[in-house]
Amino acid sequence: MSGGQDLQLPPGFRFHPTDEELVMHYLCRRCAGLPIAVPIIAEIDLYKFDPWQLPRMALYGEKEWYFFSPRDRKYPNGSRPNRAAGSGYWKATGADKPVGSPKPVAIKKALVFYAGKAPKGEKTNWIMHEYRLADVDRSARKKNSLRLDDWVLCRIYNKKGGLEKPPAAAVAAAGMVSSGGGVQRKPMVGVNAAVSSPPEQKPVVAGPAFPDLAAYYDRPSDSMPRLHADSSCSEQVLSPEFACEVQSQPKISEWERTFATVGPINPAASILDPAGSGGLGGLGGGGSDPLLQDILMYWGKPF
């Protein structure tokens, strides 16, 4: 029972009307605007909802629920009803059944609800019996009006009994749950990949030390660049890509020309004669310099 607490019903009351009782005592009176003794049938636009939503909107019912509902046209100037409802549609099944004798007062139609889009919807167990008045002029009474019937009476039930969960097709169509709802993350490529994983930086390896001063001067000066680079970055890495400013060292040929102007070199004389009288008169007292002595000793060796 849903909403029955608002009704004043006697103990043991059960609402199981026949087709004739539904038509004569409820549908005919509602269409004529006459009062109904016990307003036990709710008035809603049934085609705005899925059938499993309807039980909680009913005023009374346990396994079947009753509603008054308007019915619209599918096309403005046609007589075909619009059967789309909620996340699916109602589809007629079987032949129409006249209600009333000897002359039919109403027509009973059975329909089955399909979840999803027509014509590939998923059949459900929800059934509707629709009662509409017979011999009613349903031509377009108003221009561009889609209303086909102001009121029809509908009985809704699930043939398996009770409340059945909505099918997967209806759930997906309603957007309640996304099938395969996991979000797939694609691997980062291109520029983003380069940003996320910086290229490997090779450590800068210093050249070998030259403890021998003669070996130092024997190396070409261009092979020993001095890097002068200022940067605002917090990290500076030596790389061949960076421009370098090279300060040249005196070349060996320059030393040879220098010593050629003073004649043969006598290393012993330069050491024994600190005053420079051993043939280095133009150099003054440079022979006493330790660095110069090492140079002279080197050039005094035979090649």
Curated annotation (Swiss-Prot):
Tissue and organ distribution: Widely expressed.
Domain annotation NAC: ranges: 9-159
Subcellular location: Nucleus
Database matches in SUPFAM superfamilies: NAC domain
Gene null: resulting phenotype: Increased root length in young seedlings.
UniProt xrefs under InterPro entries: NAC-dom, NAC_dom_sf
GO MF annotation list: sequence-specific DNA binding
Gene Ontology BP term (one): positive regulation of response to salt stress
Highest taxon of the lineage: Eukaryota
Main localization of the protein described in the UniProt heading: nucleus
PROSITE patterns: NAC (PS51005)
Annotated keywords: Activator, DNA-binding, Growth regulation, Nucleus, Stress response, Transcription, Transcription regulation
Induction: Induced by drought stress, salt stress, cold stress and abscisic acid (ABA). Induced by methyl jasmonate. Induced by infection with the rice blast fungus Magnaporthe oryzae.
Statement: the UniProt record of this protein carries the keyword Transcription regulation: yes
GO cellular component: nucleus
Described purpose of this protein according to its UniProt entry: Transcription activator that binds to the promoter of the stress response gene LEA19. Involved in tolerance to abiotic stresses. Transcription activator involved in response to abiotic and biotic stresses. Involved in drought and salt stress responses, and defense response to the rice blast fungus. Transcription activator involved tolerance to cold and salt stresses. Transcription activator involved in tolerance to drought stress.
Note: Plants overexpressing NAC048 exhibit growth retardation. Plants overexpressing NAC048 exhibit improved tolerance to drought stress. Plants overexpressing NAC048 show increased tolerance to salt stress. Plants overexpressing NAC048 exhibit increased tolerance to cold stress. Plants overexpressing NAC048 show increased resistance to rice blast fungus.
Domain notes for this protein: The NAC domain includes a DNA binding domain and a dimerization domain.
Quaternary organization: Interacts with NAC071.
Protein name: NAC domain-containing protein 48
Gene: NAC048
